[in-house]
């Protein structure tokens, strides 16, 4: 198979069925995902949430109904079941010190979901589990020593000299941080294969609604539980099927915005605060951030609509503002909107669900698909995480 090289990037030959990855660049080799068994259709959310929390406040019901419609979410999954509420009724008692109970549930649940997602990913990858040299584990939903990275490694049967990295409490941008860290590991350790796993549950923040905590209702209407996994490595072998190349990664925070998104762990669980100006702050800074990433593609004529977009769907308002600010064509954020509809905002996991949809979309387009794209996520800080991605998929 012949190929030419322009701007440091390998190009397809006319007979190729996949773009060739650049030597030494990290590539995505397989994906997996997992969810708890409890499915929550959005149309049933209000009735179930108010019943479980023993709330009969008409104002709260009306507010939650409105939020459920505006989120665009249709389906979510949750660890929380009636059996759990029967065992721990104090979870629905205002002011009850329940952090111990919440962690008993969460610590086990996130590892089990991570295990299922990882097994699916490894199966798609097709190589022995012993070939995994590094594991990066991302979660904002568990607290213990040792962490979920060790428990997951043991359950998967990874070698006891596997190199482990645990990323705690990053929030919604954690999945892209994990990709950035895994990219650095893969590119600086020749022959390495990195398993990145993210796993999240909302059990730490579940509580009865209170008018003094309006964000709790946003969380009830928007967030879900689940896990995701991806194998990352440079210089793929013939037995591997790379579909995206992580060409460049960057993180930055917006000075003076650390109070816009806050989470504080208390005896009652984790209390969140979300500023109403979050979408505006993202809108005001997104264009410069994206141009910084695009500049690394080596094509100064490239415009926003010349690329594919994998954006963490923090909520419809963020997607709408980004779309308007960058003058994106409607279909550019379709994978992000689809992930939001199907799973809700699942914190760090969600970007990997978006990338799975994007992989399918690029494959369907074949030679007509864009070669370059951006992966973006936003979270506490306000922190921006970004990836310049190169699609390796063609017809």
From Swiss-Prot:
Expressed in flowers and flower buds (at protein level), and, at very low levels, in roots, seedlings, leaves and stems. Mostly confined to anther tapetal cells. It is an enzyme of class 2 (transferase). Its EC number is 2.3.1.-. Pathway: Secondary metabolite biosynthesis; flavonoid biosynthesis. The keyword Phosphoprotein does not apply. InterPro entries: Chalcone/stilbene_synt_C, Chalcone/stilbene_synt_N, Polyketide_synthase_type-III, Thiolase-like. SUPFAM superfamilies: Thiolase-like. Keywords: Acyltransferase, Developmental protein, Endoplasmic reticulum, Flavonoid biosynthesis, Transferase. CDD domains: CHS_like (cd00831). The active site is at 172 (nucleophile). Disruption phenotype: Pollen exine layer defects. Reduced accumulation of flavonoid precursors and flavonoids in developing anthers. Plants lacking both PKS-A and PKS-B are completely male sterile, with no apparent exine, thus leading to pollen grain collapse under vacuum. Altered pollen-stigma adhesion. It is found in: Endoplasmic reticulum. Gene3D superfamilies: 3.40.47.10. Optimum pH is 7 (at 30 degrees Celsius). Substrate binds at residues 224-225. Belongs to the thiolase-like superfamily. Chalcone/stilbene synthases family. Plant type III polyketide synthases (PKSs) that catalyzes the condensation of malonyl-CoA units with various CoA ester starter molecules to generate a diverse array of natural products including long-chain alkyl alpha-pyrones. Accepts up to C(20) chain-length fatty acyl CoAs as starter substrates, and carries out sequential condensations with malonyl-CoA to produce triketide and tetraketide alpha-pyrones, potential sporopollenin precursors. Favorite substrates for are midchain- and v-hydroxylated fatty acyl-CoAs (e.g. 12-hydroxyoctadecanoyl-CoA and 16-hydroxyhexadecanoyl-CoA). Homodimer. Interacts with 4CLL1/ACOS5 and TKPR1. This is Type III polyketide synthase A. The lineage of its organism: Eukaryota, Viridiplantae, Streptophyta, Embryophyta, Tracheophyta.
